Each structure stands twice: as C-alpha cells, then as structure tokens.
C-alpha cells in the first residue's frame, strides 16, 4: 500500500510547530490530512490526502518552520539492506520521469550517521533509475528532482 502526501524538513525540536503549521494550511483547504512526526527527527509528514492536493494547499513561502517541502511518493519501511534498489524502482513504477536525483537525510543527530550511506546509495541507484528510463542521462531542470530520504538504513521516503 502506498503512503503519499508531503514531507517537510525543519530544525530538530520544531516538529510540533511545523506539524501545527501544516495542519492549519490543509484545514483551511478542507483536506482530511494529518501530520505524522517524531520529536527531534527534523521532519514532518502530512498524510491522508493525495500528494498533489496537499502540496497545492501549502505554499512554501507561507511556512515559517519549514526548511524545505517535497511531495511524498511513498514510504518504504523494513527494507532488506542487501537490496534497497528494487523496492525503490517498484514504488516509482508509473510515477513519472525525473531530471535529477538527490539522496539525503534529515538534519538530525540520529540521521547524520546516514550521510555516507546516502551518498553510496545514490551512486548505486542513479544507473538503475536510468536503465529503467526513470532518470534522464544528464540533469534536466524541466523535470522534477527525485528526493530519496534516508530515515534509517532500512527506511526510506521517496
């Protein structure tokens, strides 16, 4: 089952503030979305409505606590650490083509240890995406960037 919505980064410790801010904006638009977060994680997810609707309801320039926001294609949990690429490719099937790839992690103490893994995974994922036709050969600003976010070594957000 797909988890879609929106993810927004914030400074660790400000998750409740960002969750309230995002919830306010979706409530104004009458969307049945809800915030999901963990204290000091550095991010908040908005779930419960189509990602396009949530994204349209929340203009980045109106946010105080968000550092960045992205549409959330899927959440992949309990991944086999021997093969993280296959579930990513499966989750992206039929979801469009991307002009660039960014593999990252939230700015939290717990997630900083994932920096090396994120870089190595990006180097392995990039050719697999290109082989499937999901990523252009060269960066293309006219197409969206695919953000792959490491929450832990076996938990990714797309």
PLM feature segments, named:
Residues 1, 15-16:
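N-terminal basic/disordered segments at the start of proteins
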Residues 144-158:
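C-terminal edge-of-domain segments
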Residues 3-4, 9-11, 20-144:
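Non-catalytic nucleic-acid substrate-recognition regions in nucleic-acid-modifying enzymes
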């Amino acid at each position: 089952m797909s988890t879609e919505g929106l993810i927004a980064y914030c400074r660790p410790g400000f998750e409740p503030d960002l969750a309230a801010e995002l919830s306010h904006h979706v409530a104004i638009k009458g969307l049945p979305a809800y915030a999901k977060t963990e204290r000091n994680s550095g991010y908040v997810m908005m779930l419960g409505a189509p990602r396009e609707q949530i994204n349209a309801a929340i203009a980045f320039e109106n946010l105080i606590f968000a550092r960045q926001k992205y549409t959330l294609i899927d959440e992949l949990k309990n991944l086999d650490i021997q093969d993280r690429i296959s579930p990513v490719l499966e989750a992206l099937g039929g979801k469009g083509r991307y002009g660039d790839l960014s593999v990252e992690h939230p700015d939290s103490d717990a997630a900083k240890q994932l920096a090396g893994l994120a870089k190595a995974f990006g180097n392995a994922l990039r050719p697999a995406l290109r082989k499937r036709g999901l990523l252009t050969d060269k960066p293309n600003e006219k197409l969206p960037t695919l953000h792959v976010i490491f929450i832990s070594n076996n938990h990714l957000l797309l």
